[in-house]
Amino acid sequence: MPEFSLLAGHFGTLKKTIQGMPSDATLHSIMLKISQQFSSGIFYINMWPFSGTWMVVSTPSAASQIQKLNLTKPVILRRPLETVTGGPSMMSMHGETWKKWRALFNPGFNPGYIIGLAPNITDEVATFWLSCAKGQQGEVFPLESLTTRLTVDSICSVVLDTQLHHQIKDHPLATALQRQIDWTTFGTTFNPLKRYLTIRPLVLWYNNKVMDRIIGGEVDRACRTPPDHPSKSVISLALREYLQEQASTNSTRSLAEFKRLVAPQLRVFLFAGRNTTSSTLIYSYYLLAQHPEVLAKIRAEHEDVLGADPAEAQGRIKEDVQLLNKLPYTTAVIKETLRLFPPSASMREGRPDAEIIGEDGQRYPTVGCNVWTLTVALHHNSDYWDQVENFIPERWLVGPEDPLYPVKGAWRAFEFGPRSCIGQTLAMLELRIALAMTIRQFDITPAYDEWDSIHPATTAKEVNGHRAYQAERGAGGAHTADGFPCRVKERC
């Protein structure tokens, strides 16, 4: 446990750590720095006056124990999550209710099913490609403005079978969701105005009305789809599963009730997937630009599998989506990117009968604590990763005899077990397609030096040696600092 004050708790430790970091560094990054003081990989920290006591863990063993204890999400997460999603969703549900909804959507996110929707994603990436081509006219611009729109369009295309065209023009659904996120605090901000500003309820009410209207219309459209021409979208598959379940149990639940209950699930797919996939794509470009030898290898793999002409990649994928399963080095690049820059973590609520046993045999009670598996600390723990700070995609391709081989349970970008991220297959698919359709067409390089000359900083602007550090910008998400200012140049 960090040094404790009877008057201020651990606030002094937090303040001291924050002072040496950028003002918008994520709480994950702050806790990573604190966690490096504790070799056991488990410590307690009192978050007064913002929260209670947290147990922070960064070992595979402790993370696995937390997963198996089946702890619930704490109130400090459930409330803001349900504010964003408009009600209980798979992210905040527990027990039998969660099992029901997870079972309903599992078939739609099955790897064998989701890869069949790859052509939808290629169409959205083609629009992203055109946006990059426009951006390569010499100006420095924040790439996040494009990647977030790409992920929103891709998710809606796959889940709802609808094209928002948010990459071309602001769409009301995406705009309302962004406003909802911006006006929701996840307890990671220390700004009291952002926490307690009284106009918030009115803004949230309006956003909910907009999103419910649009999502309700899409569910109605799925209901009207002719049975002989069924849509392949995730929502259509879930609707068919729901109707079959109702018929088999003689239930009288109406479609109106399904529409009301399913809306938060659809919102959570957008909320959970938009920033995480967007930031991972950006960090892939960032790391590839820093490691030309890795960039050469991934481009060579794409040429071998998708053909010599990069412009034909989309057509090749549409003709044979299974080609995407023949890109092991690309997958390794993505997994290594997620190791160095995991976009999220996992927090649960402790209980009296739940203890975590450390690797030294010491018992750590969880009662009265929010138990946080700090993924970024686990991924940067040198006890479990050889050359921990180096970007080495090959570690995902070697055998168990190699020192680089990952320790079981040490990589938790999507968590493990029944409550692992349901959208991980979609995220990995979208990332493979985006890299396959862009990395040979463009050189995407960070332009922080130019950006900083125009926007001089008064505080530190690096975390762990990276100018492209993970930054806080609403809803506890880990964004790329300053939206990743870059230059895009089309390759000859």
Curated annotation (Swiss-Prot):
Metal-binding: present as a keyword of the record?
yes
By its UniProt entry, which Pfam families does this protein fall under?
p450 (PF00067)
Keyword set, alphabetical order = Heme, Iron, Metal-binding, Monooxygenase, Oxidoreductase
**Enzyme class label:** oxidoreductase
Q: GO molecular function: any one?
A: heme binding
Q: Which cofactor does it need?
A: heme
Which GO terms fall under biological process for this protein? aflatoxin biosynthetic process
Q: In which pathway does it act?
A: Mycotoxin biosynthesis; aflatoxin biosynthesis
The domain of life is: Eukaryota
Indicate which residues the UniProt annotation says bind heme: 421
Q: Which residues cross the membrane?
A: none
Question: What InterPro entries does the entry give?
Answer: Cyt_P450, Cyt_P450_E_grp-I, Cyt_P450_sf, Cytochrome_P450_monoxygenase
- EC no. given is 1.14.-.-
* Role summary: Cytochrome P450 monooxygenase; part of the gene cluster that mediates the biosynthesis of aflatoxins, a group of polyketide-derived furanocoumarins, and part of the most toxic and carcinogenic compounds among the known mycotoxins. The four major aflatoxins produced by A.parasiticus are aflatoxin B1 (AFB1), aflatoxin B2 (AFB2), aflatoxin G1 (AFG1) and aflatoxin G2 (AFG2). Within the aflatoxin pathway, with the versicolorin reductase aflM, the cytochrome P450 monooxygenase aflN is involved in conversion of VERA to demethylsterigmatocystin (DMST).
Entries under PANTHER family matching the protein: CYTOCHROME P450 (PTHR24305), CYTOCHROME P450 MONOOXYGENASE STCS (PTHR24305:SF222)
Family as reported in the entry's similarity comment: Belongs to the cytochrome P450 family.
Q: What is this protein called?
A: Cytochrome P450 monooxygenase aflN
